């Protein structure tokens, strides 16, 4: 390990007790530093697994529990190709007419699963994610809220050093390709197959954007809830790359909130990769414009700390990248519709 990496890691350790967000920034930078001449950027190779469709085969970790049972039933009714699930000690049984396995590795071998959704209590959720990584499941969606940040630091450290498994979440609603595949807790009936890619840190605001784009007749191509925790597996840039490369996605809605610097990074990415006459229209809303500094607002990552992470700075960065920022979540649908109208895309 180089001296640079050691110094960065030591600094992150000192800061972690006083500021989780500062630690997150330092750790994320550390992960991108060179170690022994090798840049650990292979995790970006797993972005392709974010896209799901009718052929995606899913297993559920925590299958026989209350949450796992309810949401698995909802997924099956939606038409999702759920092929089984895991609950340690209950292997060999049937649940919802599907096989139960003791381990993720066995479930993958027997079902050919390409994705896993996790409904496991917070103290055990990180272990469930690690088990899915061990089994080389291409896509892991963790719904669980309240996972200890120290657990997720370790998970993130491991994720960034491999390129086989992509994690969405934790503390997120999941991902849905309307009419084809639903992985998570979102209400399926408000979605409609269409043209808008939606990515959000907030679950309920995702549903608001979905409902509005359905109402104005644009629908959705893919909707991704990345979660509001400071240590998550997928960020805005990961999703934006998927949307920009997806021919079915003609416009994008990005919903951010105070805390961290994910929105500023997304703005820089859009400025570089989504400009010129063929740029896709992007509309955004940033929650928390009136939030007081130093107070956490709902999500663990939604906090203005050290004078950074405020809504105004995020809005300014997005606008400088050509993003149309709506001042109200109630206007997301009409705003993206007007952008389509302006560009003669209707």
UniProtKB/Swiss-Prot annotation:
Location, primary (coarse class): mitochondrion
Binding annotation for CoA: 64-67, 90, 143-145
Positions carrying N6-succinyllysine: 57, 66, 338
InterPro entries, per the entry: Cit_synth/succinyl-CoA_lig_AS (IPR017440), Citrt_syn/SCS-alpha_CS (IPR033847), CoA-bd (IPR003781), CoA_lig_alpha (IPR005810), NAD(P)-bd_dom_sf (IPR036291), SUCC_ACL_C (IPR005811), Succinyl-CoA_synth-like (IPR016102)
Location of N6-acetyllysine modifications: 54, 57, 66, 81, 94, 105
EC numbers: 6.2.1.4, 6.2.1.5
GO function term, MF aspect, one: succinate-CoA ligase (GDP-forming) activity
Pathway stated in the Swiss-Prot or TrEMBL entry: Carbohydrate metabolism; tricarboxylic acid cycle; succinate from succinyl-CoA (ligase route): step 1/1
Residues at the catalytic site: 299
SMART domains: CoA_binding
Catalytic reaction equation(s): succinate + ATP + CoA = succinyl-CoA + ADP + phosphate; GTP + succinate + CoA = succinyl-CoA + GDP + phosphate
GO BP: tricarboxylic acid cycle
GO cellular component, one term: succinate-CoA ligase complex (GDP-forming)
Repressor listed as a keyword: no
Gene3D superfamilies: NAD(P)-binding Rossmann-like Domain, Succinyl-CoA synthetase domains
Entry's localization field: Mitochondrion
Keyword flag Zinc-finger: no
Transit peptide: 1-34
Keywords associated with the record: Acetylation, Ligase, Mitochondrion, Nucleotide-binding, Transit peptide, Tricarboxylic acid cycle
Family statement: Belongs to the succinate/malate CoA ligase alpha subunit family.
Self-association and partners: Heterodimer of an alpha and a beta subunit. Different beta subunits determine nucleotide specificity. Together with the ATP-specific beta subunit SUCLA2, forms an ADP-forming succinyl-CoA synthetase (A-SCS). Together with the GTP-specific beta subunit SUCLG2 forms a GDP-forming succinyl-CoA synthetase (G-SCS).
Task of the protein: Succinyl-CoA synthetase functions in the citric acid cycle (TCA), coupling the hydrolysis of succinyl-CoA to the synthesis of either ATP or GTP and thus represents the only step of substrate-level phosphorylation in the TCA. The alpha subunit of the enzyme binds the substrates coenzyme A and phosphate, while succinate binding and specificity for either ATP or GTP is provided by different beta subunits.
Listed HAMAP family: Succ_CoA_alpha (MF_01988)
Protein name: Succinate--CoA ligase [ADP/GDP-forming] subunit alpha, mitochondrial
Species name: Mus musculus
Name of the gene: Suclg1
């Amino acid at each position: 390990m180089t001296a640079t990496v050691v110094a960065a890691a030591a600094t992150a350790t000192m800061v972690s007790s006083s500021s989780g967000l500062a630690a997150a920034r330092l750790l994320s930078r550390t992960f991108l530093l060179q170690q022994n001449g090798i840049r650990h950027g292979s995790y970006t190779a797993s972005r392709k697994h974010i896209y799901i469709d009718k052929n995606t085969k899913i297993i559920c970790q925590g299958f026989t529990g209350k949450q796992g049972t309810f949401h698995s039933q909802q997924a099956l009714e939606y038409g999702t190709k759920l092929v089984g699930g895991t609950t340690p000690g209950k292997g060999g049984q049937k649940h919802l007419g599907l096989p139960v396995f003791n381990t993720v590795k066995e479930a993958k071998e027997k079902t050919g699963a390409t994705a896993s959704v996790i409904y496991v209590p917070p103290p055990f959720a990180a272990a469930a994610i690690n088990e899915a990584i061990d089994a080389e499941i291409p896509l892991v969606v963790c719904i669980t809220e309240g996972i200890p940040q120290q657990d997720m630091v370790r998970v993130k450290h491991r994720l960034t050093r491999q390129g086989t498994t992509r994690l969405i979440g934790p503390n997120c609603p999941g991902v849905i390709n309307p009419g084809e595949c639903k992985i998570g807790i979102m209400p399926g009936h408000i979605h409609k197959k269409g043209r808008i890619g939606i990515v959000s840190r907030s679950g309920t605001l995702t549903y608001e954007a979905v409902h509005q784009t359905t109402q104005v007749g644009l629908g959705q191509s893919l909707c991704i809830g990345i979660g509001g925790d400071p240590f998550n597996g997928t960020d805005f840039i990961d999703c934006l790359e998927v949307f920009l490369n997806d021919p079915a996605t003609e416009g994008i809605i990005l919903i951010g909130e105070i805390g961290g610097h994910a929105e500023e990074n997304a703005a820089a990415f859009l400025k570089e990769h989504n400009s010129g006459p063929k740029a896709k229209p992007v509309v955004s809303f940033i929650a928390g414009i009136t939030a007081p500094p130093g107070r956490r607002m709902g999500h663990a990552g939604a906090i203005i700390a050290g004078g950074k992470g405020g809504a105004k700075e995020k809005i300014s960065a997005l606008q400088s990248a050509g993003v149309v920022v709506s001042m109200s979540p109630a206007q997301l649908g009409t705003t993206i519709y007007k952008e389509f109208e302006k560009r003669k895309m209707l």
